Amino acid sequence: MHTQVLFEHPLNEKMRTWLRIEFLIQQLSINLPIADHAGALHFFRNISDLLDVFERGEVRTELLKELERQQRKLQAWVEVPGVDQDRIEALRQQLKSAGSVLISAPRIGQQLREDRLIALVRQRLSIPGGCCSFDLPTLHIWLHLQQPQRDAQIETWLASLNPLTQALTLVLDLIRNSAPFRKQTSLNGFYQDNGDDADLLRLILTLDSQLYPQISGHKSRFAIRFMPLDSENGLVPERLDFELACC
């Protein structure tokens, strides 16, 4: 059983979008293989949410900019004595490769948007109970296909996201590992500090405290209010130690 809980909070819009995309892509794989109606609806709902996120911004453009920014940051480390040059060069090549694959890929999500089954299910998701067999006979017959046939189709759908997934995973890994966790202490359930142009806050609390953070702010400054899970009887200690990384 976990004794610590990690919370992450974005400090700008691009990071908020990236974390949502990461979450949705992870959700797509949780219930695989799809063998029943519940698993299918979970999968298609996350596909629909993912396409909605894609339509709200220039995901590819922002990721390409970030890949270039991370390459520049790595270049600055080359001159630092004692740095693992091979590791730096390997990361730079990974960033360069991910950028090349992403820029040459079709429009993100285009294959999913054009798929007839996904489009049909997506239209019905906003209707309460709108995915019954009489509403979506296409989905009903799809769920009665042989498992390998469904698996192959899902694999094709997910493969269309690989250029995005590869670039996003690399970028988020570098950002998350860009700053160490440091011990901090809140007073009367409140903590604030400068953001120093950070993109992401990462915070670790012990599970036995049964507290969660409410975080607000941006890249320059942020504030954290610690709240009890039990809003009626829970208590927040006068001094609370936690770990924080500004990435």
Swiss-Prot record:
GO cellular component, one term: cytoplasm
Broad class of where this protein is predominantly found: cytoplasm
Annotated organism of origin: Salmonella arizonae (strain ATCC BAA-731 / CDC346-86 / RSK2980)
Location of this chain's protein in the cell: Cytoplasm
Protein name, per record: Cell division protein ZapD
Role summary: Cell division factor that enhances FtsZ-ring assembly. Directly interacts with FtsZ and promotes bundling of FtsZ protofilaments, with a reduction in FtsZ GTPase activity.
Keyword Translocase among UniProt keywords: no
Quaternary structure, from the entry: Interacts with FtsZ.
Keywords, ordered alphabetically: Cell cycle, Cell division, Cytoplasm, Septation
Cited Gene3D superfamilies: YacF-like, YacF-like domains
UniProt family annotation: Belongs to the ZapD family.
GO biological process, one term: division septum assembly
